[in-house]
Amino acid sequence: MLGLRQRAADDPTTEAGAVPAEEAPRRPRSPLRHAITLVLALAMTVLWAFLATLVLDASAWPAPLNALRHKSFESPALWESVAVVWVFVLLVVALIGRLWIALGIVTAITALIGVVNLTKLELRNDPLYPSDVVFLGQPSFLFEMVSKAKLVEGAVGLVLIVVLAAGFGWLMNKLFPGVPRSLSGRGLLGLRIVRVVVVLVCLGLLNLAGNFNDPGNPWRAAFDSTGLRWRNWDQRVNYQRNGFVSGLLFNMHITAMNEPKGYSKAAVDKIAEKYAAEAARMNQGRTGSLDKTNVVTILSEGFSDPTWLKSLKYAATPIPRTEALMKKTVSGKMLAPGYGSGTANVEFEVLTGLSMSQLEPQVSVAYEQLVSQHKTFPSAVQYFLDHGHTPVAIHPFSPRMYARPAVYKAFGFDRFISKDQMQDTRHGGGRFIDDQSAFDEVLHQIKDHQQPVFTHLVTMQNHMPFGGQYTDPLEPTGLPKNFAKLAGQYGRGIARTDQEFASFLAALKKLPEPTAVVFWGDHLPPQIYPQSLFKTEGLRNMHQTPFVIWSSGTPLKHTTLPTTSPTQLLPHLFDAMNVPIPPWYALLDTLDQQIPAMDAGLYINGQDEEVKRADLTPEARKALTDYRMIMYDFSVGKRYSEKTMYENAPTG
């Protein structure tokens, strides 16, 4: 496999009776030469694995070349990472059978992964996860998410790397030829056996790496023995401090949630009975009803209030109508579980009441890694079905994103309308279907149904990338020029959303039946703010977006709620509308009184203070323990409590 082809003897003499050169027997190599060749070849694979590891580690930093110089040896698990990459290198060499060609292929793969990781970090502030492989089947999404300039740069760079790698492999193969083509018999058979054995061993080791999070996994034990700290609360830092390979392995498949201590049917039933009694107590004073009211939940892509950032100054707020509305109805700040991305996870939290912060950190997209694995999944859709609503989900983009068709079906939605089924598909100058078209689709659904409708809308207008959409940007001061231009495009986009949302509410007021609306932004936009802003603004401020709860019927009393998790938005709607609730929402209300908002490693108490889990009050810890038990039962467990916790509450 790794040997060098013997050069044919080329004796120019033509004496009588001499055997022609091409028919002369090859001189066998000495065992020493074989050993030296093998050692050198193996050394090259180790060197390539080492270099590939350094390149991948550097791709987790904003300035990769600088990281290569100053950060290359910081990972405590560097050599364990090299070992994993080396196994992959050996696999490619054994499969290809030509050392230098195989190393060229490894170089190209390393470059591709590094570029993709760096680009994803720039655009979404998140590193590359194993679960991102699903996007390979959605090239249209990738092309729309990345600017044309980035695509051209990436394509040219990749082609250049592949050409250079192929040329290098070709040249080295000429200088150091491989196994002779004429090799036959036992020699060829032996070579093939060795290659097959290497392939099988490498596949076995890589399979172990793929099960990195299994109890007793030897790879995990080796990495843990180095003393590295898994930064599960911040995956970007996790990849930077522990290395790309460590971060990637850490995010391999895992059970979504660890079983809480004492989980059993008896324990779950006891909690369910407790909150059934609490719901009955709360419902005694609730006389409202949603039975004849349309309910619309609107996840507004990338919507935020940039004036909340102290570093930015605008001549006028981009969202004056929304700000005015927040002073008239129920509203507040939502603590988004992510920055620049995580739309599907915010959806998951709102519709299920289950917090991403309580799942294992390796669950990067709950829709794909949890919900889509089930035929049914407990959600608010069941509540609305029980109250006579027709549930409809609308998303003006590709239907395949984040396994939404399977997820919405599991939740219980009757229909999912993607961009292919929408009646209006205007773009309004932007890359994606605009919010006016999305709001019009909601109006169509309400008008087309006799019974009340529960409509869940996820918009696309303000999705990245930003740049070149609008001719009338709203640029702030306080940002570097290149960021200010992008922020100006974003500012104009949310200004249009602000206007279109106000028009949508005005249209709802004209309908004969009442409609309740929950509107929120899923996260701050990626790409437009420098990393330095996190230091000046603070992590919490970079994760807060506005939310509004509004009714076209009886106006809701103005209330500014404490900082809220997405899981609490529907409970706040039910509170504002004074409607009876099932036990699950009684549990969420109880949790809200103690911990209104939480994120990975962060809890905000009733006094709006950031506290660690260990510093929670006994009441808060008890509510969280109950919540985690039922959450596990819903998501991973036996669902002993589903029927009781979602039991239809009597209408007022």
Predicted regions and their residues:
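Transmembrane and membrane-interface helices of multi-pass
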Residues: 2-238
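Short hydrophobic "helix-edge" motifs at membrane interfaces and signal-peptide entry regions
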Residues: 87-88, 290-292, 511-513
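Short, solvent-exposed loop/edge-beta patches enriched in aromatic
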Residues: 95-97, 288-299, 328-330
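Short secondary-structure junctions and interdomain/linker hinges
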Residues: 119, 146-153, 166, 178-179, ...
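Membrane-interface micro-motifs in multi-pass membrane enzymes
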Residues: 130, 239-244, 340-341, 433
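Membrane-interface segments at or immediately adjacent to transmembrane helices
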Residues: 207-297
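Solvent-exposed soluble domains appended to multi-pass membrane proteins
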Residues: 280-286, 300, 305-652
